[in-house]
Amino acid sequence: MEYDYIIIGAGSAGNVLAARLTEDADVTVLLLEAGGPDYRLDFRTQMPAALAFPLQGKRYNWAYETDPEPHMNNRRMECGRGKGLGGSSLINGMCYIRGNAMDFDHWASLSGLEDWSYLDCLPYFRKAETRDVGPNDFHGGEGPVSVTTPKIDNNPLFHAMVAAGVQAGYPRTDDLNGYQQEGFGPMDRTVTPKGRRASTARGYLDQARPRNNLTIITHALTDRILFEGKRATGVSYLKGDAGTGQTAHARREVLLCGGAIASPQILQRSGIGPAELLQRLDIPLVQALPGVGENLQDHLEMYLQYSCKQPVSLYPALLWFNQPKIGIEWLFNGTGVGASNQFEAGGFIRSRDAFTWPNIQYHFLPVAINYNGSNAVKEHGFQAHVGSMRSPSRGRIQVKSKDPRQHPSILFNYMSNEQDWHEFRDAIRITREIIAQPALDPYRGREISPGANVQSDDELDAFIREHAETAYHPSCSCKMGDDKMAVVDGQGRVHGVQGLRVVDASIMPQIITGNLNATTIMIAEKIADRIRGCQPLAKSNAAYFIAGDTPARTSPVRHSLPVTSYP
């Protein structure tokens, strides 16, 4: 089999490339996906409110685990990644957050990445998006990604939590992806107008599937990339459970879109990576690149949970006897509790004036439950997810063998820098101040977690070590740039070889301020134009917020009360 392009991974980036490259009728594309189809009749991946289910089990989830994390009580921590058409957009929380404008301006300040500024990237965010309330300077109206905005009559806890954030002295913003990310406000989500998950399989592949120049093979696990000298010429993969070896050849390029965990694995198995690691595993060296698998970053988060004095939370939706009605309304009408991911409000703040742009993110949820659906509190409640955005901690990914079925060694090295501890202590204390504001007086009951007795630095640190979780945002493990640890250039081309690019979240040089899916799609849209030889979209001229000397917060309406004294 021979194609112009072979794409490894039908995820958030790979599906974008497959759709855009096959717009050229004379180009042939093979799309390889290790998982199966995105079964449209499986409510677990299609119903937004069922987002916890795909993380349970291994049908749609690679279910990686980290090595024991030394600063987290040596816990082996979850590292879920999507498996199937759509990749992690098939199992994520559907929060449509692009990051802060300053993230991209920081990227553009790095050598070789000058065209990755916010105003360079904004046109590609707009190209990818169709927002339900229409386009403007920041949002698109004709893209494959369906973006739904929260409606005014949604759960009152969303409005109360945003109001409480403002009363605590932080800004309000009407659009976390618009002029000003900083502040509290409504949170957009990747959900269709009919209440279905808007994965990249639904948005991009559905457009491309009818084209004769696209071939999609599922249950195809990539073993390694093939080379002739320094040129990538094809892919060796295993088909199905039997593991029958297959080979496909690429006339032009191999495009690696495996994500931040799989892409460095595949490069290392293919002979591209740290020379000492490859030598130890008897993998023939094609190109020594010490940065492959290094610079690994993620977002860590915690939940602060509270009981709710009024029966307005989503707790009844967790009871089995209420779920058939919810499912029927969603299935036939695309409405109701099932049609939302229930992350409809949140925010970004600076915990201290020293930060140039937000370093803390909030997701508000009108129920008290773990992200993966476990440990639901058996009463009406709500919670704030809170975590730091740009931790200085760095991890790494290393293959353990040549076997493509063996999971790699993953170490994020969470909380390995003193700044991490300062930020998380600040985050807990600030959250308590927010929850103490008058807007939540009608709803706020007792603090369930961490609990009123957790107050000192040592007590907070113990809670963080035991309870902080991944936000499922691994990135930066094949970073772009031109320094000695960079893996790809600003167009995704792997240094030192020809005919090979990496296009996914792994090429971010630094993690962004927020959820990764929207930015991963943007990266693929931008590089797709490069691959096709298209003129880049014209830079935006939209104005955007820069904090400058603006204080991180103003005086709160109510200064923090002792946790035991909440009304």
UniProtKB/Swiss-Prot annotation:
Catalytic activity: choline + A = betaine aldehyde + AH2; betaine aldehyde + NAD(+) + H2O = glycine betaine + NADH + 2 H(+)
The enzyme's E.C. designation: 1.1.99.1, 1.2.1.8
HAMAP family with a match to the protein in the record: Choline_dehydrogen (MF_00750)
Active site: H473 (proton acceptor)
Phylogenetic lineage: Bacteria, Pseudomonadati, Pseudomonadota, Gammaproteobacteria, Enterobacterales
Keyword NAD listed: yes
PROSITE patterns: GMC_OXRED_1 (PS00623), GMC_OXRED_2 (PS00624)
SUPFAM superfamilies, per database record: FAD-linked reductases, C-terminal domain, FAD/NAD(P)-binding domain
Any one GO molecular-function label of the UniProt entry: betaine-aldehyde dehydrogenase (NAD+) activity
Function of the molecule: Involved in the biosynthesis of the osmoprotectant glycine betaine. Catalyzes the oxidation of choline to betaine aldehyde and betaine aldehyde to glycine betaine at the same rate.
Protein name: Oxygen-dependent choline dehydrogenase
Keyword Zinc: no
Biological or metabolic pathway of the protein: Amine and polyamine biosynthesis; betaine biosynthesis via choline pathway; betaine aldehyde from choline (cytochrome c reductase route): step 1/1
Positions annotated to bind FAD: 4-33
Domain of life: Bacteria
GO cellular component, one term: membrane
Keywords attached to this entry: FAD, Flavoprotein, NAD, Oxidoreductase
Organism name: Yersinia pseudotuberculosis serotype I (strain IP32953)
EC main group: oxidoreductase
